[in-house]
Amino acid sequence: GAPPRRRAMNLPPLREVIARHGLSASKALGQNFLFDEQLLDRIAAIPGDLAGRDVLEIGPGPGGLTRALLRAGASVTAIEMDRRCLPALAELEDAFPGKLRVIEGDAIKIDPATLFAGAYDIVANLPYNVGTALFTGWLAGARGHENDWPPQWRSLTLMFQLEVAQRIVSEPGSGAYGRLAVLAQWRARARLAMKVHRSAFTPPPKVMSAIVHIEPSAMPQGV
């Protein structure tokens, strides 16, 4: 066969993969698929140079963002509970030998610390129905290790509904300021990295989306 880099560059378009596997975004699982490969590459660039780094992706679906992360040189561990998507992800495993590990399961029930020996980045177009719960869990720290800071993750690059993203990065005293901002800014730095128009998704969600990038502070702010 072709060398790995050639194989990786010759991937069929995402739309073709989705059509071939008969995939459609599941409303029950809070899925919205992204097809724009340039946009996906821009998202994968937000955490900085990922070459040789370990990345955790939640809910990869048909693997659009997964491809972009692999193209950026990351080693990706992807947790997916929708088994319809597993054959499409298996094709990516073949195209990027040894660089993608797919775990079928529920991300809420999996402790990332069990998946990585060292530091890792989390990059995800989070399923809307579990996004906030996962996010608050990562910020709070693993049960019994809440005081271990900085955490094992190096950064979080996460897609949310725009309104949720704005709450996360809001300033004290603003109308959006509340629990999410307090949690995000207590011992981390949060910024709104990119807005994503609803038309970028299939099916288009009712609202705009945005990507928040978070890095842990060395010491909790204001302690």
PLM regions: where:
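Catalytic cores of RNA-modifying enzymes
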Residues: 2-223
